[in-house]
């Protein structure tokens, strides 16, 4: 009887969600880019009357670009502009028979170039802007700073983006450790946990930015990923039933499948500082001031090393905001990016 009830419940759920029209299946255009064994999904949505396309590049590596659409900040941008969301290889809903030989930063830069060319071919009369978040900031910096790729765009938005892995691992350490004494002194503190962080860094003074996951756990415990989790959850309800049953999303969207630490050791050595000097287009470094994942000093570092004229580059740090302004501070996120696009389109 219990199994029958479950089957009936699932049937009713499927019926309910299938009776409603889903934005994911009715809005925009959905297609794939196949390259070197990877079949990468691309969703173009938003305001097709706009002359502007904002190509987004997700973080991780190993996250999913389609998830940007669930963030209120990106939804507001979709009202004004066309937006491109896509999943990188080894990420999100990407399929295919690609192998570990393609799990390297240069291949991801090549994939990004293919995506840009595909968008240019399908929408030849549009003005392009590029946005990279977290690892996507690092990826877009590496891409823009090579082979004159920045000439394809009117502007670059670096959203809490990485750039120099070794430096950022140390900045995370400097962000985390000064907060531990106060945490240890709090009434009822979990002293074992907080002391463990101190001990871990003593044993691992120079962690890998990509191969060591522990610092990211510590940042999250200190609200450096999401500044206020309660507010975040209230403002960002995720429509899981709709995503699973009435969208192009598959269950693989919820599974991190980027690989093992030993497969990405070379990623810890990424430094795209030289590429920054080759980028001369307008640039906006948009950051959560309280970001502990990619601390806000990185925004200043990127600004200082960019080849862009000072009159066309700026750093904006949003208070009481962690690693995701698009979800934590959507109004400020939208206002800053919209103003940037309107200025340089």
Question: For the regions a protein language model found, what residue spans apply to each?
Answer:
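Conserved acidic catalytic loop of the alpha/beta-hydrolase fold
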Residues: 109-127
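Conserved alpha/beta-hydrolase
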Residues: 78-95
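Conserved alpha/beta-hydrolase "acid-adjacent" motif
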Residues: 292-298
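Alpha/beta-hydrolase
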Residues: 188-274, 281
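Conserved hydrolase catalytic core segment
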Residues: 125-171
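The serine-hydrolase catalytic nucleophile loop
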Residues: 63-73
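Catalytic histidine-centered segment of alpha/beta-hydrolase-like enzymes
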Residues: 321-330, 334
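Short beta-strand/loop motif that positions the catalytic acidic residue
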Residues: 279, 285-287, 291
């Amino acid at each position: 009887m219990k199994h029958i009830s479950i089957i009936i419940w699932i049937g009713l759920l499927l019926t309910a969600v299938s009776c409603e029209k889903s934005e994911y299946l009715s809005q925009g255009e959905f297609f794939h880019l196949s390259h070197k064994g990877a079949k990468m999904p691309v969703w173009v949505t938003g305001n097709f009357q706009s002359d502007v396309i904002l190509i987004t590049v997700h973080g991780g590596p190993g996250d999913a670009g389609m998830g940007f659409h669930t963030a209120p900040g990106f939804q507001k941008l979709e009202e004004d502009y066309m937006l491109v969301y896509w999943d990188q290889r080894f990420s999100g809903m990407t399929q295919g028979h690609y192998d570990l030989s393609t799990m390297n930063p240069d291949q991801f830069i090549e994939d990004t170039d293919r995506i840009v060319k595909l968008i240019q071919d399908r929408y030849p009369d549009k003005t392009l802007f590029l946005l990279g978040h977290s690892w996507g900031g690092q990826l877009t910096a590496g891409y823009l700073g090579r082979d004159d790729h920045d000439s394809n765009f009117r502007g670059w938005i670096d959203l809490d983006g990485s750039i120099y892995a070794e430096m950022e691992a140390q900045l995370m350490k400097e962000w985390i450790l000064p907060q531990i004494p106060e945490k240890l002194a709090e009434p009822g503190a979990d002293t074992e946990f907080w002391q463990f962080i101190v001990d871990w860094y003593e044993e691992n003074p120079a962690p890998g930015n990509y191969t060591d996951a522990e610092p990211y756990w510590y940042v999250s415990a200190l609200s450096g990923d999401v500044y206020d989790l309660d507010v975040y959850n209230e403002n960002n309800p995720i429509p899981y039933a709709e995503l699973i049953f009435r969208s192009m999303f598959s269950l693989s969207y919820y599974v991190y499948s980027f690989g093992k630490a030993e497969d990405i050791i070379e990623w810890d050595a990424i430094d795209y500082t030289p590429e920054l000097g080759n980028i001369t287009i307008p640039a906006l470094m948009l950051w959560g001031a309280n970001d502990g994942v990619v601390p806000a000093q990185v925004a200043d570092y990127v600004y200082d090393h960019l080849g862009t004229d000072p009159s066309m580059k700026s750093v904006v740090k949003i208070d009481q905001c962690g690693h995701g302004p698009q979800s934590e501070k959507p109004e400020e996120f939208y206002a800053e990016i919209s103003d940037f696009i309107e200025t340089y389109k």
